[in-house]
Amino acid sequence: MNGRRWAVVAATVLVAGVAVTAALAASSRHSAGKTFYFIPKDTLNPYEVIADTGGKRALTELGDTQVVSSGTEDTAAAQQPAIQAAIQAHAAGIVIAGNDPQAVCPALQQAQAQGTKVIAFDSDVNCRQLFINQADTATIGRSQIQLLGKLMNYKGQFAILSAASTATNQNAWIKYMKLELKKSTYKNMKLVKIYYGNDNPAQSRQATVSMLQAYPNLKGIESPTTVGISSAAQYLSHSKYKGKIVLTGLGLPSQMKTYVHNGTVKEFQLWNPDDLGYLAGYAIAAMADGKITGKVGDTFEAGKLGHYVVIRGPDGRPQVVLGPPYTFTIKNVDKFTF
């Protein structure tokens, strides 16, 4: 074979190789231009707003569009119009924070039947393909009681100020709080009652007043909801109970730093909700692309957060865990802006 023919063959092989490489690269890339609906518990909760913003950041990086839609109340009924809007728009995916694990399922299953992918984040639902968990559920619940116990010197009565009575994440955390309380370490601590503020500031403040009136010997309040803990802190900071009642839970540094500095709250915990939404954004995009299906062992890349693996959750269903909770104190709370 002469030199010219060798050159033609070599060029042909090179072009073919480039084509194969390009095809493989294209198959691994995200197909941009999709629309995804983020349906928070409600649109007024600052925590949910931050999480949704993280989701928008992820989808913008991927060249997609985010629509945030929900009601202004923490109920499943208030989320139904948003789900129907996603169905009508033939959205590529829905990311929802459940107010009720089952009530939204008929509508979500209708969405799935037409090809819309469904992921839950922050608070789980029964009919999703994947759950983006802010931290290991058991770790959150147990660490809340561990922190409360330390702050109460492991003795006295305390109450829990939760969100909605049907909130999946709240109930799961409280389950593990109760399990942690069975340890001998907490034999001198007593949970007197669980109150529900429905993630409404006014209702949460009233619940705080009610528990203090009902239990004059109350020593602590545990609130695993950002609305609950900030509302309770606001009331306590202007009352005779400031510095006398231990208040801890899950809070936003931006809302809680004032109460940490004025002595109302010593320590509280959370994770970065912006990162939670960001992770959910990458996960729903990967699912819409067919890169993951929600099967245990699936892997995907989540932008700045790196590599994630789908694992089996405590209930046996697939989930992705953002990371461990973080404890905020007067020494570090000013370092955070979310």
PLM features: residue spans?
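Bacterial N-terminal signal peptides
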Residues: 10-19
